[in-house]
């Protein structure tokens, strides 16, 4: 439950968009040794990290115009989005959902796109 202050539990997602998706995915699998996972509703090559976090490799445009994004896991997504809006932060109007999470994007003061999960 949201208590008026956002509680970030950790980083649950890191993603990158690249024109070299096949090469990057091969590097992640073959050199870094990350196991690939399939999640319904995700249009990226998705890999499992320790602790349950995910790393995604997508084609250009798959991470917004910044090319990369980080997803912060919060205890109450809806409450955290209300808090961002109240602080004047630009929040994507749609809450997305895949087989694992509900999530929403926001643009931080540095101009980059981030995600709450």
Predicted regions and their residues:
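Conserved short beta-strand elements that form part of the metal-binding/catalytic scaffold
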Residues: 34-67, 113-117
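Conserved active-site tyrosine of GNAT-family acetyltransferases
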Residues: 24-31, 84, 111
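Short beta->alpha transition motifs characteristic of CBS
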Residues: 14-17, 58, 97, 116-117
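N-terminal beta-strand motif that seeds the catalytic metal site of vicinal oxygen chelate
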Residues: 1-25, 68-70
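Short beta-strand micro-motifs in enzyme catalytic cores
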Residues: 43-45, 68-70, 100-104
């Amino acid at each position: 439950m949201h208590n008026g202050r956002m509680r970030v539990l950790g980083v649950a997602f890191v993603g990158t968009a690249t024109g070299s998706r096949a090469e990057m995915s091969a590097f992640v699998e073959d050199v870094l040794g990350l196991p690939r996972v399939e999640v319904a509703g995700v249009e990226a090559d998705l890999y499992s990290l320790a602790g349950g976090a995910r790393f995604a490799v997508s084609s250009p445009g798959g991470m917004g115009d910044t090319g990369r994004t980080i997803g912060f896991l919060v205890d109450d997504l809806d409450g955290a989005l209300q808090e961002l809006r109240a602080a004047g932060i630009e929040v994507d109007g749609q809450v997305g959902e895949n087989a694992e999470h509900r999530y929403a994007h926001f643009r931080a003061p540095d101009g980059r796109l981030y995600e709450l999960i």
